[in-house]
Amino acid sequence: METNDLGFVASLLFVLVPTVFLIILFIQTNSKEG
C-alpha cells in the first residue's frame, strides 16, 4: 500500500489544527481566571 504524502499531511493537519486551537483556548481561559 502506497503512502500518499499529501493525504498524510492533510490528515495530520486535520487532527493537529483543532488540537492546537483547543490548547490555546484552554491556556487563555486559565490565564484569565488566575
UniProtKB/Swiss-Prot annotation:
Keywords: Membrane, Photosynthesis, Photosystem II, Reaction center, Thylakoid, Transmembrane, Transmembrane helix
InterPro entries: PSII_PsbM, PSII_PsbM_sf
Transmembrane region(s): 7-27
Keyword check for RNA-binding: no
Signal peptide: none
Keyword Transmembrane helix: yes
Assembly mode: PSII is composed of 1 copy each of membrane proteins PsbA, PsbB, PsbC, PsbD, PsbE, PsbF, PsbH, PsbI, PsbJ, PsbK, PsbL, PsbM, PsbT, PsbX, PsbY, PsbZ, Psb30/Ycf12, peripheral proteins PsbO, CyanoQ (PsbQ), PsbU, PsbV and a large number of cofactors. It forms dimeric complexes.
Protein name as it appears in the record: Photosystem II reaction center protein M
Organism: Synechococcus sp. (strain WH7803)
Gene encoding the protein: psbM
